[in-house]
């Protein structure tokens, strides 16, 4: 049924209700999931624009459909801005997600059965870094390095595994590591075995763009990322690379027609405006505050006798190990959720429980920083988290924290300009 004047509210009240309730949840819950953020009204607007109607297989100036002259402008803006923002020589803005960006980069760099050396999932890696349940572990032979006893990446182990297995690709990147990656050291390990060096900066892309976290873009052969998380754009992917005409051609072919058809032009336009937002001076201030808030929270939890993997944080997240607390990550996540504090359970080094239960929590500060929280609020929030974890079955404590969290959220609305 096509009726231009009929709203979702009047046509599909069930769906409208779910969206309304999710809007309310985002306003009244404290978001501490490290991979989540709040996009700007501009990003929201573009994702609902008429660009969603246009098929545009191919690349700007080389399309398989007519009528692409205006979406070409949008995509070229996204490409040019991505290259400028990250100091890249090449950018492909068509990947639908970070996972797809990884799959496409692998396709350009490896053949099925080749060896991939990446971080172990239980030490902070990602499913697409060679987990046996992922395409990356099914199509390629995955070998994994982890963290050392000090909670840092075990570069010596990575170098030893590289010499032993001679991987085609060495990947540096993470989903739950709170330190700074030594990109150059990985470059040297890759060069020692004539491997491609690939980086996945999905979690820290916004920090890299702002210049508050080291950039691997001109060190690695290929860099992938999501465009949400710390970058605060739409949920999608991006591939970057330093100059290499042959590799650029293979990357383009891996994206289209290798694994995707028509690009999502409304999402690409949203990427373009998000990249422009990230170029503003205010974005660097935002990224710096993310780091300050994460450090403030981690310090409070350490003072309250909680174990922080790697001993602290140098980015936007930190991992709390509950191995010595007789609390599972699942229990902790649920208890905090009842207090309107959203976190995610996470595996930790030395994990003894299943990935569905876990012994840890991952905590991140991009979303609360977007709301306007600073160190004062971040520290206060960390104390509330500890209050609940200290007495996890005490519903009175949970109810008290829920009220405090509700009041705090009321002082820092997410989308006040849309009300």
Swiss-Prot record:
Keywords: Amino-acid biosynthesis, Cytoplasm, One-carbon metabolism, Pyridoxal phosphate, Transferase. Its main location: cytoplasm. Signal peptide: none annotated. The keyword Nucleotidyltransferase does not apply. Coiled coil: none annotated. It is found in: Cytoplasm. Its cofactor is pyridoxal 5'-phosphate. Belongs to the SHMT family. One of its GO terms (biological process) is glycine biosynthetic process from serine. Gene3D superfamilies: Aspartate Aminotransferase, domain 1, Type I PLP-dependent aspartate aminotransferase-like (Major domain). (6S)-5,6,7,8-tetrahydrofolate binds at residues 121, 125-127, 354-356. It is an enzyme of class 2 (transferase). This is Serine hydroxymethyltransferase. The gene is glyA. It comes from Coxiella burnetii (strain CbuG_Q212) (Coxiella burnetii (strain Q212)). Pathway: One-carbon metabolism; tetrahydrofolate interconversion; Amino-acid biosynthesis; glycine biosynthesis; glycine from L-serine: step 1/1. Catalyzes the reversible interconversion of serine and glycine with tetrahydrofolate (THF) serving as the one-carbon carrier. This reaction serves as the major source of one-carbon groups required for the biosynthesis of purines, thymidylate, methionine, and other important biomolecules. Also exhibits THF-independent aldolase activity toward beta-hydroxyamino acids, producing glycine and aldehydes, via a retro-aldol mechanism. NCBIfam families: PRK00011.1 (NF000586). InterPro entries: PyrdxlP-dep_Trfase (IPR015424), PyrdxlP-dep_Trfase_major (IPR015421), PyrdxlP-dep_Trfase_small (IPR015422), Ser_HO-MeTrfase (IPR001085), Ser_HO-MeTrfase-like (IPR049943), Ser_HO-MeTrfase_PLP_BS (IPR019798), SHMT-like_dom (IPR039429). GO terms for cellular component: cytosol. The modification N6-(pyridoxal phosphate)lysine is found at residue 229.
């Amino acid at each position: 049924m096509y009726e231009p004047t009929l709203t979702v509210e009047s046509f599909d009240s069930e769906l409208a209700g779910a969206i309304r309730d999710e809007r309310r949840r985002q306003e009244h819950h404290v978001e501490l999931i490290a991979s989540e953020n709040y996009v700007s009204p501009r990003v929201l607007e573009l994702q609902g624009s008429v660009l969603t109607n246009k098929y545009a297989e191919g690349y700007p100036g080389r399309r398989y459909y007519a009528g692409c002259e205006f979406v070409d402008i949008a995509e070229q803006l996204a490409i040019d801005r991505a290259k400028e923002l990250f100091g890249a020589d090449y950018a492909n803005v068509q990947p639908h997600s970070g996972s797809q960006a990884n799959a496409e980069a692998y396709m350009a760099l490896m053949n099925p059965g080749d060896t991939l050396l990446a971080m172990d999932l239980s030490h902070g890696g990602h499913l697409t870094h060679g987990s046996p349940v992922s395409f990356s572990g099914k199509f390629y032979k995955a070998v994994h390095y982890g963290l050392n006893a000090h909670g840092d990446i075990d570069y010596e182990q990575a170098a030893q595994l590289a010499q032993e297995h001679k991987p085609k690709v060495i990947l540096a990147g993470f989903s739950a590591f709170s330190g700074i990656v030594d990109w150059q050291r990985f470059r040297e390990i890759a060069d020692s075995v004539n491997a491609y060096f690939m980086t996945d900066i999905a979690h820290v892309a916004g920090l890299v763009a702002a210049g508050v976290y080291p950039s691997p873009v001109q060190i690695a052969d290929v860099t992938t990322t999501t465009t949400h998380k710390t970058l605060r754009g739409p949920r999608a992917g991006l591939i970057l690379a330093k100059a290499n005409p042959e590799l650029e051609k293979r990357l383009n072919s891996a994206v289209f027609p290798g694994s995707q058809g028509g690009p999502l032009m409304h999402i690409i336009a949203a990427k373009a405006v998000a990249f422009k937002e990230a170029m503003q001076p205010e974005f660097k201030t935002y990224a710096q505050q993310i780091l300050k808030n994460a450090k403030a929270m981690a310090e409070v939890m350490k003072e309250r006798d909680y174990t922080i993997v790697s001993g602290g944080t140098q980015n936007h997240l930190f991992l709390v190990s509950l191995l010595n607390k007789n609390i599972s990550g699942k229990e902790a996540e649920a208890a905090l959720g009842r207090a309107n504090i959203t976190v995610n359970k996470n595996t930790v080094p030395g994990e003894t429980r299943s990935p569905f239960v876990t012994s840890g929590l991952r905590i991140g500060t991009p979303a609360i920083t977007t709301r306007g929280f600073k160190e004062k609020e971040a520290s206060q929030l960390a104390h509330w988290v500890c209050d609940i974890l200290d007495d996890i079955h005490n519903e009175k404590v949970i109810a008290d924290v829920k009220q405090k969290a509700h009041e705090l959220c009321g002082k820092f609305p997410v989308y006040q300009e849309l009300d």
